[in-house]
Every structure is written in C-alpha cells, then in structure tokens.
Amino acid sequence: MFEGAAALNLDAKGRLAIPARHRDALLAASEGSLVLTAHPHRCLLLYPSPAWQPIRDQILKASSLDPRAASIKRVLVGNARTEEPDSAGRILIAPELREYAKFEKTVYLVGMGTHFEIWSEAGWKQQNDLAAEALSGDLPPGFGDLVL
C-alpha cells in the first residue's frame, strides 16, 4: 500500500529515484516492470505492471467511436510506457511525458494506495489549493461518516 507524498528531484537524464521506503514494495509488486502513463489532470501515473493490466483492459473495452472514450484511451493507453528500474532504483521518465506533465527539476511522488501519481511542483501546489477549497464545504458522497 503506497501512501504519502515526497518531493524529489529528477536527474539530468530525467530519471526519478524511487524513495527507499517504497522501493522494495514497489519492485515486489511490479515483478520488475513498471508502467508510466499520462493522466488527464496533467500528472503521471506509476503502476506496478500487474496492477496496470486490468485497468488497461477495462479502458480498451470502451468504444473508440465515442469521442470522449477515444480521448481517454489516447491519454491513458497511448502514453503508457513500460519501464524497468535500474540498479539504483531509478526510472526514466520519457521526455514526452515530462513535457506533458510540465515537469521541471522538482516533482512530487504521491502514494495513492495501489499506485503513485507524479506531479510537477506547481501542479501539486495547485491540487492542494483546490482540495483545501473543495473541502471547506460539504463532504463528497461516501465521506460523511469519516472520522479523523
């Protein structure tokens, strides 16, 4: 189970070092293969390959004749890349994906349970600001009984 957010720096080649606290669990869940893809909110998603496969299969079942479904397929499946971590636990983020997500030097790796989101520094700040604003009112369905 992946959780928590970490500010990380990409190296000069665009590689991201997976933090030690997540590395072993991610590599075990991934069977050595990770999938990076774009998300419609301009972040990237990082999945262990076995966790991505059923999601990909579900996406591919949608009709390509529906313009919205076709757009979702293009973003999620069309941008998907399989990557293998190097011996130092780094993964290469392709230039196209870095450009899509507007990455500069610092990115945020955000644990989302079964996978990670990877945000640009500006994108992560914006998401936190939007969340604070959205949560100042009524809670969304399913969160009414949540006790913190």
UniProtKB/Swiss-Prot annotation:
Gene3D superfamilies linked: Transcriptional regulator MraZ domain (3.40.1550.20)
Keyword Cytoplasm appears in the UniProt entry: yes
GO MF, one example: DNA-binding transcription factor activity
One GO term of the biological process aspect: negative regulation of DNA-templated transcription initiation
Domain annotation SpoVT-AbrB: ranges: 5-51, 80-123
Keywords: Cytoplasm, DNA-binding, Repeat, Transcription, Transcription regulation
Record keyword Repeat present: yes
InterPro entries (UniProt xref): MraZ, MraZ_C, MraZ_dom, MraZ_N, MraZ_sf, SpoVT-AbrB_dom, SpoVT-AbrB_sf
Record-given protein name: Transcriptional regulator MraZ
